[in-house]
Amino acid sequence: MRLLQLLFRASPATLLLVLCLQLGANKAQDNTRKIIIKDFDIPKSVRPNEEVTATLAVQTELKECMVVKTYLISSVPLEGGFNYKYTACLCNENPKTFYWDFYTNRTVRIAAVVDVIRELGICPDDAAVIPIKNNRFYTIETLEVE
């Protein structure tokens, strides 16, 4: 009963302050870090059998490091460096950029894939985390052949 009397005596300014603090706390909880941030860059169009360079820049907002494996997948088989797979230690303060050079003579859809994996000997002292929710990230682009 005494608590209710105190509540009704509280000034509107105090009640507004408590409400704002509650809303601010909820908003701060929604501010989550991104596991993987990727930027996949390939030309929109090329001539037949012209060399293509694909670039994938990867970074994280997590405080912990992760072991990542990056590779490309295409809608049609491609030759050359297209089939290279890279494994690296990805940390917040050390983003990575990966490159692939290949040739194609027809239009192709290409997916750049980043898998967070468990592998020893990649990160210093083998200190790396694996996200529980997602461990595969990808983006798809189309390369037109004129």
Curated annotation (Swiss-Prot):
**Claim: Zinc-finger is one of the keywords in the record:** no
Source organism's superkingdom? Answer: Eukaryota
Its subcellular locations are: Secreted
Gene Ontology biological process terms from the UniProt entry: proteolysis; regulation of immune system process
Entry's SUPFAM superfamilies? E set domains
For this chain, one GO molecular function annotation is: aspartic-type endopeptidase activity
Q: List the disulfide bonds.
A: 65-91, 89-123
For whether the record's keyword set contains Cell inner membrane, the answer is no
Where in the sequence does glycosylation occur per the annotation? 105
Q: What's this protein's family per the entry?
A: Belongs to the PIP family.
Main location group: secreted
Pfam families this protein is in?
A: SVA
**Which protein is depicted?**
Prolactin-inducible protein homolog
According to the UniProt entry, which residues carry Pyrrolidone carboxylic acid? 29
Alphabetically list the UniProt keywords: Disulfide bond, Glycoprotein, Pyrrolidone carboxylic acid, Secreted, Signal
Q: Which GO terms describe its cellular component?
A: extracellular space
**Signal peptide positions on this chain:** 1-28
The record's subunit annotation is: Monomer. Interacts with AZGP1.
Q: Which InterPro entries match?
A: Ig-like_fold, Ig_E-set, PIP
